[in-house]
Amino acid sequence: MIPIDRHLLFLINHEWTHPSLDRALGTLSCLDFWMPLLVLGAVVLVWRRGWVGIACVVVCGMGVLTNETLVAQPLKKWTARPRPYQSEEGIRRVDLAQGRPRLFSIVKPPAVEVVAAPDRRGAGRSFPSAHTLNAMTLGLVLARFLRQRLWWLLPPLMAWSRVYTGSHWPSDVLASLGMGFLLTQTVLWVAWRASRRGVPPFTHAAPFLAPGGARPSLT
């Protein structure tokens, strides 16, 4: 374990904390909360933007599928790196409160537990962070298609949340940000090449896929 990795973990997970951050970052890190909203957002995007919306959803799907099947799951099995709460005492595990549907748990106090002893059950799945990989994909693709740079904030916020909630080491998320950027740029390049060859739905989104195309605005 790199000393600075452990030091940063305890700063973010223990020192730089606040009840409002527990709620905000615990919610951001909870996939069950966001899944119905992601589906709804995809439907609205297709309804509002037509073929361009379909292309955006397809590119996001390609990126997430690439992240999960070619990178995240194979590397998790190969490295078997324990999560912080599996290897360190005193880790704060922060999560959205339990409930069904999870969406309604936003009104409940977040679940915060201090791990007295490492929980070594289960295989280590800390590296890489799939949440961070996929957040990078969504952030870059949505910034490109919606032309809003604010989406660029999603990847670093997700990376922060994964360390804050005790789910990953800082080195996990930093490496995942880099890998996610390279993988997403590759997927965007493949989609752009497909648009040049007349492959639908990418042909309808060529201006958004072209390298050096229209730059997103700040809003």
What would you call each of these model-derived segments?
Residues 42-74, 147:
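Interfacial segments of alpha-helical transmembrane regions
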Residues 101-219:
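Membrane-embedded catalytic cores of phosphoryl/pyrophosphoryl-handling enzymes
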Residues 41, 66, 70-71, 75, ...:
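Alpha-helical membrane-inserting segments
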Residues 1-40, 71-119, 206-219:
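N-terminal transmembrane-helix/juxtamembrane module of multi-pass inner/ER membrane proteins
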Residues 61, 92-96, 177-178:
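Transmembrane helix-bundle signature of multi-pass membrane transporters/permeases
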Residues 48-49, 79-80, 165-169:
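Short helix-capping/hinge motifs at transmembrane helix termini and TM-loop junctions
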Residues 37-48, 135-141:
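Hydrophobic, aromatic-rich transmembrane alpha-helices
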Residues 31-35, 52-56, 148-152, 170-173:
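Short, aromatic-rich membrane-interface segments at the entry and exit
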